[in-house]
Amino acid sequence: MIEKKVVSQLIEEKLASSSNYLVDVVIKPGNLIVVEIDNDEAVSIDDCAELSRYLEEHLDRDVEDYELEVGSAGITSPFKVLRQYVKNIGNEVEMLLKNGSKLTGVLKSADENGVVVSVEKKVKPEGAKRKVTVVEDESYTFDEIKYTKYLIRFK
């Protein structure tokens, strides 16, 4: 079986000279290698084709046969690496926390410790008859987050 570590290392070597970065490598039964890459701007089909050719040059089909899929991380795919969070600062995201609660808000910041999201909440001030909307910044560590993904809104 082809090792994920070997494939990841080859990809990192190839992408080191570009603005693309590795999001994930999955090796499925039957040696199906699925590679996801991303970019702070956009990943082109040429980027995917170039990486695919590079991997085919460096992995020997005579030793072990495999099937290869190289693609970009989809816009609705959950974020898997910190750089995807940083790329989406200022965008609206949907988060599912491990405690089961789901929230939407604007991603304010992200670093190796976690993320800060601005969330709108309805709060009833003391003595008021109606609830008012307030925006609060909430911090979460990556251990608390099950997934985060870009929120697409059609208006």
UniProtKB/Swiss-Prot annotation:
<keyword id="KW-0690">Ribosome biogenesis</keyword>
<comment type="similarity">
    <text>Belongs to the RimP family.</text>
</comment>
<protein>
    <recommendedName>
        <fullName>Ribosome maturation factor RimP</fullName>
    </recommendedName>
</protein>
<keyword id="KW-0963">Cytoplasm</keyword>
<dbReference type="GO" id="GO:0000028">
    <property type="term" value="P:ribosomal small subunit assembly"/>
</dbReference>
<dbReference type="InterPro" id="IPR003728">
    <property type="entry name" value="Ribosome_maturation_RimP"/>
</dbReference>
<dbReference type="GO" id="GO:0005829">
    <property type="term" value="C:cytosol"/>
</dbReference>
<dbReference type="Pfam" id="PF17384">
    <property type="entry name" value="DUF150_C"/>
</dbReference>
<dbReference type="InterPro" id="IPR028989">
    <property type="entry name" value="RimP_N"/>
</dbReference>
<comment type="function">
    <text>Required for maturation of 30S ribosomal subunits.</text>
</comment>
<dbReference type="InterPro" id="IPR035956">
    <property type="entry name" value="RimP_N_sf"/>
</dbReference>
<dbReference type="Pfam" id="PF02576">
    <property type="entry name" value="RimP_N"/>
</dbReference>
<dbReference type="InterPro" id="IPR028998">
    <property type="entry name" value="RimP_C"/>
</dbReference>
<dbReference type="GO" id="GO:0006412">
    <property type="term" value="P:translation"/>
</dbReference>
